Amino acid sequence: MIASVRGVVQLIGQDQVVIDVHGVGLAIAVPRTVLATIGAIGDTAQLYTHLHVREDMLALFGFSSPAQRALFELLLGVSGIGPKVALALLSAATPEELQHAIAREDITMLSKVPGIGKKTAARLVLELKGKFGVATISPQLSTNPGLLALNTELIDILTSLGYSTTEAQAALNALPADAPADTEERLRLALQYFGGV
């Protein structure tokens, strides 16, 4: 997987940028929110990327943070949502706004996004609501967006151990603010919350 790209901005389009990495121009589709922050042609830019593989093509999608990329990958896991619709969702709102809309079951807001009807918005809420939880976004995520991918992984681990999604989220929300951004250590602390260690 190509996890990130750093290079000189060669071209800025409506929904993509071309970044020159040592003489190779990579076309990277990006949300509009990223286009607004990419800088100008000739500037150096870094994007966190997702390589989408289909049998007939490879496509790179770029994001301003690992958390934004993690949310894109979560959206791709919802049936009926492909990369273009996931990109449209991230163009319409910040990751935090999307998470809040999903946690609040705000079908109206979600269905305003091009490519998302009421049925798809309802499916999105149904499949992802548990990922963000009753408490929606913990304060730790808003101050350190890189924890989104890590906490999503931890929720998956805890639910595979038999805890409910709500219990897993409660354990993660109870982690101290200075908890290290390390999967094993955060898992150990989460299990202590349950009295399992």
UniProtKB/Swiss-Prot annotation:
SMART domains assigned to the protein according to its UniProt record, in alphabetical order: HhH1 (SM00278)
Domain III: annotated span: 153-197
Membrane-spanning ranges: none
Keywords: Cytoplasm, DNA damage, DNA recombination, DNA repair, DNA-binding
Region (Domain II): 65-143
Renumbered residue ranges of the record's region Flexible linker: 144-153
Subcellular location: Cytoplasm
GO CC field: cytoplasm; Holliday junction helicase complex; Holliday junction resolvase complex
Cytoplasm listed as a keyword: yes
MF annotations from Gene Ontology: ATP binding; four-way junction DNA binding; four-way junction helicase activity
Spans annotated as Domain I: 1-64
Biological processes annotated in GO: DNA recombination; DNA repair
HAMAP family: DNA_HJ_migration_RuvA
Family: Belongs to the RuvA family.
Domain notes: Has three domains with a flexible linker between the domains II and III and assumes an 'L' shape. Domain III is highly mobile and contacts RuvB.
Functional summary from the UniProt entry: The RuvA-RuvB-RuvC complex processes Holliday junction (HJ) DNA during genetic recombination and DNA repair, while the RuvA-RuvB complex plays an important role in the rescue of blocked DNA replication forks via replication fork reversal (RFR). RuvA specifically binds to HJ cruciform DNA, conferring on it an open structure. The RuvB hexamer acts as an ATP-dependent pump, pulling dsDNA into and through the RuvAB complex. HJ branch migration allows RuvC to scan DNA until it finds its consensus sequence, where it cleaves and resolves the cruciform DNA.
Record's subunit section: Homotetramer. Forms an RuvA(8)-RuvB(12)-Holliday junction (HJ) complex. HJ DNA is sandwiched between 2 RuvA tetramers; dsDNA enters through RuvA and exits via RuvB. An RuvB hexamer assembles on each DNA strand where it exits the tetramer. Each RuvB hexamer is contacted by two RuvA subunits (via domain III) on 2 adjacent RuvB subunits; this complex drives branch migration. In the full resolvosome a probable DNA-RuvA(4)-RuvB(12)-RuvC(2) complex forms which resolves the HJ.
Entry-linked NCBIfam families: ruvA
Protein name: Holliday junction branch migration complex subunit RuvA
Organism: Herpetosiphon aurantiacus (strain ATCC 23779 / DSM 785 / 114-95)
Lineage, opening ranks: Bacteria, Bacillati, Chloroflexota, Chloroflexia, Herpetosiphonales
Gene name of this polypeptide: ruvA
